[in-house]
From Swiss-Prot:
Keyword Membrane attributed: yes
Listed transmembrane segments: 33-53, 62-82, 96-116, 138-158
Subcellular location: Membrane
GO cellular component terms listed in the entry, alphabetical order: membrane
Protein's name according to its UniProt entry: Transmembrane protein 253
PANTHER family in the record: TRANSMEMBRANE PROTEIN 253
Organism: Homo sapiens
Principal localisation: membrane
Length: 217
C-alpha cells in the first residue's frame, strides 16, 4: 500500500511538472520573457536614480535611498522569472510568487513615502540643481511604480496558471447560455408533432362536417 501511494504521488508530481513545463515553455513563454526583461530593466534603471537622489539630498547617505529596495527585489524577481522560463520547476513558481508579492508591497510603500516626501518637501526654488533633483525623484518614483504594476501583472498571470482559474464565471455563464439554447430547441421539436396532430384533427373534423352536409336528413 505504501509503495502504491508513493507511486501515485510520484505520478501526480510528474503530471504537475509536465503541465508546468507546457505552461512556461509554450503557452506563456512570451509573457514570462516580457515580464523578466521588464523587471530587470526597471531595476537597473531605478538603482542609479536612487543613488543619484541620495547623493544630491544628503551627501550619498544610502539610508535615504528607499528605491534601492524595490530595485534589488526587482533584480531577484526578474532572475527567478527567467529561470522559470528556462527550466520550469514547481519551487520556482512559489519563489516567483513570493518575490512578486514582496516587490509589490515594498514598491507600493516606497512610492507612497517618496511621493509624500516630494509633496511635503521645501518650496521649489529657481535653481537648476533643485529642478534636476525633482526630475530624478519623479523618475525614480515612476520607475518604482512601473515595477509595482509589473509585479501585479505577474501575480495575475500566476493566478491563471491552473485551468479555469479567474474564468470559471464566464465559462459557467457560457454553459448556461448553451443550456438555454438547447432548451429553446427542444420545445420546437416537441411542438412540431403537436401542430401536425392539431392540423390532422381539423381536417378530419372538416371531412365529417362535409359528409354530414351531403347526407340526406
Amino acid at each position: 500500500m505504501e509503495d502504491r501511494a508513493g507511486e501515485q504521488e510520484q505520478e501526480r508530481h510528474s503530471l504537475r511538472l509536465e503541465k508546468l513545463q507546457h505552461w512556461a515553455r509554450h503557452r506563456q513563454s512570451g509573457h514570462l520573457l516580457v515580464l523578466a526583461v521588464s523587471q530587470l530593466w526597471l531595476a537597473v534603471v531605478v538603482v542609479p536614480l536612487a543613488v543619484s537622489v541620495a547623493c544630491l539630498n544628503s551627501d550619498c547617505h544610502m539610508a535615504t535611498a528607499l528605491p534601492l529596495g524595490p530595485g534589488a527585489s526587482g533584480l531577484l524577481t526578474g532572475t527567478v522569472t527567467l529561470e522559470l522560463r528556462r527550466a520550469p520547476r514547481l519551487w520556482k513558481v512559489r519563489a516567483m510568487m513570493i518575490f512578486n508579492t514582496f516587490n509589490l508591497i515594498l514598491g507600493f510603500i516606497v512610492v507612497v513615502v517618496e511621493v509624500m516626501k516630494t509633496a511635503l518637501g521645501p518650496a521649489p526654488t529657481a535653481s537648476s540643481q533643485h529642478a534636476g533633483l525633482l526630475v530624478l525623484e519623479l523618475s525614480a518614483e515612476a520607475f518604482t511604480l512601473g515595477g509595482v504594476l509589473v509585479s501585479v501583472h505577474a501575480l495575475f498571470l500566476l493566478s491563471q496558471r491552473k485551468p479555469g482559474c479567474c474564468r470559471s464565471q464566464s465559462l459557467h455563464y457560457q454553459e448556461l447560455q448553451e443550456g438555454f439554447s438547447e432548451l429553446e430547441e427542444v420545445p420546437g421539436l416537441e411542438n412540431g408533432p403537436t401542430v401536425a396532430s392539431t392540423g390532422a384533427n381539423e381536417r378530419v373534423g372538416q371531412r365529417e362536417q362535409t359528409r354530414a352536409a351531403l347526407l340526406p336528413p
